[in-house]
């Protein structure tokens, strides 16, 4: 793909002209693919906030950067805001899907925020809402949403860089 070849995959063949036309940066595509591959592991548990933010950058911050190219927003100052908006959206998704993710053996809440509870323990905590793990999970979700708000604020500052026609869609 990065060499400009799509092989036999029809989705990649369809993507290649857009990638070429919009000049998607290869390092951004690699980071996105790394994040998607990380999600394929049998068990996903993030150790700490740094791992959370690295994951969120890979699977969503990169999408913000790619959207800059799709929307023809080339101001260098816009990039950090685009990354932050993508990260904010991913953090919100993580907060929404804690139990669903735990059912799939995933825990995106940082282990340092939830006493390193594994996904099965997070899932079991739903049956004991007053238990210590449930309290830690609720506190972690609140902390996650607070962190997301900080990233949304930065993302919103970047709207001024968007072409006018893109404002409503973003």
Predicted regions and their residues:
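Catalytic cores of Mg2+-dependent Asp-rich isoprenoid enzymes
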Residues: 1-88, 95-170
């Amino acid at each position: 793909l990065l060499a400009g070849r799509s092989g036999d995959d029809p989705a990649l063949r369809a993507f290649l002209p857009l990638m070429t036309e919009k000049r998607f940066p290869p390092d951004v595509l690699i980071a996105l693919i790394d994040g998607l591959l990380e999600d394929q592991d049998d068990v996903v548990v993030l150790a700490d906030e740094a791992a959370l933010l690295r994951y969120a950058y890979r699977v969503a911050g990169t999408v913000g950067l790619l959207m800059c190219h799709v929307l023809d927003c080339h101001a260098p100052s816009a990039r950090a805001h685009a990354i932050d908006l993508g990260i904010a959206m991913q953090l919100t998704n993580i907060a929404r899907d804690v139990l669903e993710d735990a059912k799939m053996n995933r825990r995106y809440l940082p282990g340092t925020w939830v006493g390193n509870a594994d996904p099965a323990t997070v899932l079991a905590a739903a049956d004991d809402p007053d238990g210590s793990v449930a309290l830690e999970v609720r506190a972690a979700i609140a902390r996650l949403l607070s962190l997301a708000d900080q990233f949304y604020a930065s993302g919103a500052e970047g709207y001024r860089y968007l072409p006018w026609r893109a404002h409503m869609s973003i």
